């Protein structure tokens, strides 16, 4: 068996040498064509493919043979470093616990501002002229005369229109402006979300397991009797004993929704379908009515239940993964910065961040391409001494 493997390896090495010889003897398009042809021939050879697969499997099983080759006394020292790493993870967990305490502390300071936001949106409080003053960047160079003219025109338009009170459809607009949320909102959800007055986040009390609750406050409506719909997210804030090195801060481990008390005929999470069935023998036809689930934002409050075994099917895992992402996004971005998602400014900032990364990547690609196409380019000249990188 070893002789066969050695023979296959020799053939593979010889074929690779042939590619190198072709590249040395010929240049230009002919070299590329012949190299491609030789590659195709090699990939059609089952012995070569088997040898390549065996080599790749070996690399996967032993990502670094260096560690295995270390003397026993050195391996002991590596184990000592791993134990230190576990202690680092435990300290990191303490750090995140204190961060959670700070979030709870500052949530109290933010709340008066969020309460004022709620009052303005829902026409409970009318902001003063001073509170409404805002100077967008694009108005920096506009003359006072033009500003006054624009103000007069705006006042005329306001006189012609009836005051809509507050900021209508504020949260619905926020949801529709954010792709992550707009994908959840169906057309039949929109009339209900027009009644959404506020979204709040509540953090777990000190000494309690880390968690947070999203509260969706609704005004009285024709769809359900609940005033508040809730979604609770449970978090793990300490390293897993079975895999301590995977700890990278608190992570959402599960969530619980709430029961929605729908009024008769208003449950948008269900739909009724009718099917016609034909009897095979008699040929008679009957109509069967069936109630099935329906796509809706309000399915957000009925997440899949995780069994005690923790095993979920692929669909449930995907739903929960998306659910956790949405819960985190609402807590970290939407609730504290809702006005910027209402106006679209936060979305533009997010897009700019992605554009800058893309432009940098494109520029790097262009530079690399120029170096490869430069006949005088010597890669050895560009090699820098090894640098110490901080993680």
From Swiss-Prot:
Query: Gene encoding this chain?
Result: NAP1L1
Organism lineage: Eukaryota, Metazoa, Chordata, Craniata, Vertebrata
User: Where in the cell?
Assistant: Nucleus; Melanosome; Cytoplasm
Residue positions bearing lipid (S-farnesyl cysteine): 388
- Residues of the propeptide region, as annotated, are 389-391
Question: Which residues are reported to carry the modification 5-glutamyl polyglycine?
Answer: 359-360
What the record says about its domains? The NAP1L motif is required for the histone chaperone activity.
Known partners and oligomeric status: Homodimer. The dimer binds strongly and sequentially to single and double H2A-H2B heterodimers. Interacts with ERCC6; this interaction increases ERCC6 processivity. Interacts with RAD54. Interacts with SETD1A.
> What ranges does the record list as Basic and acidic residues composition bias?
1-10, 144-163, 377-391
> What's the superkingdom here?
Eukaryota
Q: Per its record, how is this protein called by name?
A: Nucleosome assembly protein 1-like 1
Q: Where is this region: Disordered?
A: 1-32, 132-163, 345-391
State the organism of origin: Bos taurus (Bovine)
Q: List-wise, which residues carry Phosphoserine?
A: 10, 69, 143
Q: Where is this motif: NAP1L motif?
A: 125-150
Similarity comment: family membership: Belongs to the nucleosome assembly protein (NAP) family.
Cellular-component GO terms for this entry: chromatin; cytoplasm; melanosome; nucleus
Q: What does this protein do?
A: Histone chaperone that plays a role in the nuclear import of H2A-H2B and nucleosome assembly. Also participates in several important DNA repair mechanisms: greatly enhances ERCC6-mediated chromatin remodeling which is essential for transcription-coupled nucleotide excision DNA repair. Also stimulates homologous recombination (HR) by RAD51 and RAD54 which is essential in mitotic DNA double strand break (DSB) repair. Plays a key role in the regulation of embryonic neurogenesis. Promotes the proliferation of neural progenitors and inhibits neuronal differentiation during cortical development.
